[in-house]
Amino acid sequence: MSLVTVPFYQKRHRHFDQSYRNIQTRYLLDEYASKKRASTQASSQKSLSQRSSSQRASSQTSLGGTICRVCAKRVSTQEDEEQENRSRYQSLVAAYGEAKRQRFLSELAHLEEDVHLARSQARDKLDKYAIQQMMEDKLAWERHTFEERISRAPEILVRLRSHTVWERMSVKLCFTVQGFPTPVVQWYKDGSLICQAAEPGKYRIESNYGVHTLEINRADFDDTATYSAVATNAHGQVSTNAAVVVRRFRGDEEPFRSVGLPIGLPLSSMIPYTHFDVQFLEKFGVTFRREGETVTLKCTMLVTPDLKRVQPRAEWYRDDVLLKESKWTKMFFGEGQASLSFSHLHKDDEGLYTLRIVSRGGVSDHSAFLFVRDADPLVTGAPGAPMDLQCHDANRDYVIVTWKPPNTTTESPVMGYFVDRCEVGTNNWVQCNDAPVKICKYPVTGLFEGRSYIFRVRAVNSAGISRPSRVSDAVAALDPLDLRRLQAVHLEGEKEIAIYQDDLEGDAQVPGPPTGVHASEISRNYVVLSWEPPTPRGKDPLMYFIEKSVVGSGSWQRVNAQTAVRSPRYAVFDLMEGKSYVFRVLSANRHGLSEPSEITSPIQAQDVTVVPSAPGRVLASRNTKTSVVVQWDRPKHEEDLLGYYVDCCVAGTNLWEPCNHKPIGYNRFVVHGLTTGEQYIFRVKAVNAVGMSENSQESDVIKVQAALTVPSHPYGITLLNCDGHSMTLGWKVPKFSGGSPILGYYLDKREVHHKNWHEVNSSPSKPTILTVDGLTEGSLYEFKIAAVNLAGIGEPSDPSEHFKCEAWTMPEPGPAYDLTFCEVRDTSLVMLWKAPVYSGSSPVSGYFVDFREEDAGEWITVNQTTTASRYLKVSDLQQGKTYVFRVRAVNANGVGKPSDTSEPVLVEARPGTKEISAGVDEQGNIYLGFDCQEMTDASQFTWCKSYEEISDDERFKIETVGDHSKLYLKNPDKEDLGTYSVSVSDTDGVSSSFVLDPEELERLMALSNEIKNPTIPLKSELAYEIFDKGRVRFWLQAEHLSPDASYRFIINDREVSDSEIHRIKCDKATGIIEMVMDRFSIENEGTYTVQIHDGKAKSQSSLVLIGDAFKTVLEEAEFQRKEFLRKQGPHFAEYLHWDVTEECEVRLVCKVANTKKETVFKWLKDDVLYETETLPNLERGICELLIPKLSKKDHGEYKATLKDDRGQDVSILEIAGKVYDDMILAMSRVCGKSASPLKVLCTPEGIRLQCFMKYFTDEMKVNWCHKDAKISSSEHMRIGGSEEMAWLQICEPTEKDKGKYTFEIFDGKDNHQRSLDLSGQAFDEAFAEFQQFKAAAFAEKNRGRLIGGLPDVVTIMEGKTLNLTCTVFGNPDPEVIWFKNDQDIQLSEHFSVKVEQAKYVSMTIKGVTSEDSGKYSINIKNKYGGEKIDVTVSVYKHGEKIPDMAPPQQAKPKLIPASASAAGQ
């Protein structure tokens, strides 16, 4: 997705939060207060000084008046005044003392009150603090429990969004993350952690309630990067990233201001060609990226002259095609750098990128390849996305889309492609083809005229569908002939008008037939027909109909009968393979249909273009340390070739990887990104629209190394000695040997001011030191040197300094030479040099080493005392800085001439630096090893001890195979201790060292001794194993035993051999040695040992069985023996155990074995036979006993017995104590999982909450909670249950009983909860229903009713007296009415009714006659209702037989509802 560009005119707005304003306010107030205090102090000091000066003046004046003796009267007057003042002063002092005492007492009282108040407040604070601490401890525990429950890994809710901004604007990246504990967020820029302290004010990072923000202030071009945010907590890590592209505003909207003119003039859009000198300082290299990532190709350069108004032109090319800015690419040029940024890479962007700086002075360019790999597929094994979508032949409703296929190496081949279209301005993608199209071309029809579309393609293989390709450029569905029919008519003067050709043709009614019908595209899936519109065509819109006919059939079939075609193009699908067709086209408008066009020639649906043949011979050649040049012969059949794909494989692995991800059109390709020193093979395949060719033949194996060239020039030519007639010169070897060993050097000389050079040596000189003879004393000479290798003679060095030929006679030594460096690390390096050729008047006794930073002036001496060695390790250097060094030799006469300054050395460890490793090989030889994958054919390993090359063949042996070298120590001892180093020539300073100290040597020698004197490794030591029948097996297992291995068993220092008592055997294939004892008894206590010999190797293992260890083995053996005897008859394979079924029944289960028909199985409880409904089926081997609704009555000892003539066995399980508790918990688990939701049942007593379960007992651990507070059973809230449910009865509920109720049942591990919110409408409805039930119960309790006394049938003889008596109840007393046959009974002597104490009621019928037979009813009713009871009376005559009737029963009452007024009450 492209980045959203922020408009350049958007202004920056800085926001200040509340805390910032508070800080500013506090600062101003503090500053104001300090100034106020200073001014107050100054004014008080000033007034104080004025007051003191005035007092001094007044005292002096007063003193002067007293001393004056002019007037005696004045003196006496003053004495009186003085006396009066003294008495007034004493009274004032007394008053002031009293006032002061009163004030002191008042202040003391206030102080006592303050102390008392302070003590009270302190006591309150201490109490509050104690309570607060208690609450904090409780909350901390609850918080810990809560935090554990809500802990989760980070999850990003809103991801980062990419931005494109102008330079010097601010950009803010935001995202939202949640998680607990709160995730820690770190920001990264291109994988590097962002540090705010490194660039103060540059970055601002904020975090508020899960929203994290990174603000980049005043963004510049270097801030273009991929920014990532990583959120981490204890449960995981998650990240998100976005791209920030910083564009440079070029000032197109703002005119350039002239310095000399008062007005602004716009800069000319034409850049005048001016001569510029362009020098690249930093260049972009070969780049590897993946689809979807961002990248910026950038070059920094020095442009001379640097003119602000006039600049050279920067042009970017991809595969020699000029690029322009688009939504995918952004370009920038200015301020000494040119860049090309990609906001979202696709494989379309892969290619060779070239930056060309064009000016009058010429073209300066730089090229490098950008590789774009496939993004991870949506489905594993799916192919990569197609690329390079192009739209061709766009018309009113038709366009052809073409693309290039993806490369497949490890994926299965591509079977076809799906083409999708999307109307511009929408985001609705529509698949154009139902079945995958086989070739990389598809005609899309059904477009709407005038609308614009974009397209994308997806590849399909057997694994799935690829990611979609990059969308194509928008294409409009328009007729390209419309502009062709537009003509210009010239009028008088320079005027002209534009008219359509249709206006010149006049009014045409029915159009003519189309012309030029032909097949423009033929493939196996479709045929594209093209034609020319009829002439004249008329002004009305034209439509076309296409007809087809099989050759020879004579019948025509209209292809587009339903939808007319508006474009002179049409793709015909569904043609039968192998048959030829002819076509014709008819044009139509609103006036009618034209005649058919001419018939085309026969056309057959087939692939005109075939798959290309495989490319020819593939040749790989060396290029650089990480690249190889691959060339191949073009295929014989290269019709419509799209390009080639190159694959590579590490030799011997058969794991092929693509080298390029977009077809290349030339038959030579440089493969980058290879591993130095690795061996590869290559293959090539050709690609066209139909598919890919077969793979070419594989290339020969090639090792990745730099190409063989001539060596670079030597350098550092130094004069080492001169005797007046000859000079001894030294120099340094070339930095690059060219890939082959240097064979020697050629030296040329000339006198200063001479033009011609003269050859010094006709044959190459091998050493890097040479004496030049035949020189003239006092003359000045200069020299140059060239190196030679197998490729030829390299470039000569620059001429040396001017050396004067005069004899050296100074007593001090000459300069050291050939300064080299190795083991360059982050803070240290090792420096080596060679001794001076000229030693002076006495031998060289030591050396001083000086260093300095490259641009510093003063030299710093490393060693304060001279070193006698010609090497020195320089430490404590600063990483990343560049230093230069020199060496000064010292003899008895002083310090000699310093050596030439070394080349600058960057103190930094090389990436991938390897060190020497110490080890022991399979033969026990100690060695030091070193690997170097960067070596070339000319590279050599040089091993040194104390930095002196090793040449002692008696103590050392060097073996080098490929890029691996080993230094063997033949007879290691203390003389071999020291520092060993290795260096590899013709590399970028690859070297390492290793200090062999006594501890390391001892370790290596111990390992060597173990290999030379081996022991047999054991997989397992001697152990025992007890079998059935009580047999004991002693065994061990060795890693490996040869057929010649021997062994022996020793028991208590006595060897035992294979016998009936001790059966010993050995399986040498598996290494197992064992001894089996059939009878293990008390006599077998002791120590068991096995000794093994196999060639030189030997091993021993012992097992001590004494004391408790022996008793354990003996008891186990006896137990196994008894078990064996038990299993000879019927026995339990699994003893009695229990589980709980889904129906909450306890099931006792045991497994039996070795039974027969006569075997008797019994269940016993407390030694009493336990009867079961069904007998167990012993053939199944499983016996079960179900105990439904377990309770304490089921406590007891349960036994299962087996018995027949072979023996018997018993299994016992006691249900009590912990076993019973565990059963209850298991039942709780089943019931808790199946418990129903809480239900509300209203009763006259209150509201009842019920939870139905499969089984419930009071012994289950259940809790009822109200608002998360546990409820205890009370009169107000009663807790109980039945076998089917648990309930909570809320008696007489009130408003306080509202809230959430929870029922919990604990199963020993988990709490199973059911909750109900009894508040709001739910509580109101339940409370109303409770009131109704309560009123109904009250009415039911107090209504009129019959307590007893009346039968339902009465039989009596005529003439007798019938007395019907009953007892009634009601509150208030009920009204009693008697009826006969539903009619009121008229009281008389015959019928009499009696009521006693308002509850005993009787009716008497005297002299019963047959007319008294019938139904008698009694109504008992008060205001709460009542009952009606019917009694049937049957009268028979005297002498008649008593009728047969059912025995009388209690009469059944019928309810009588209460009156309306009573119901309302």
From Swiss-Prot:
Q: Which PROSITE patterns match?
A: FN3, IG_LIKE
| Superkingdom of origin organism | Eukaryota
Q: What is its main location?
A: cytoplasm
Q: Which GO terms describe its biological process?
A: extraocular skeletal muscle development; muscle contraction; sarcomere organization
State the residue spans of region: Disordered: 38-61, 1442-1465
Q: What does this protein do?
A: Major component of the vertebrate myofibrillar M band. Binds myosin, titin, and light meromyosin. This binding is dose dependent.
What is the protein's given name?
Answer: Myomesin-2
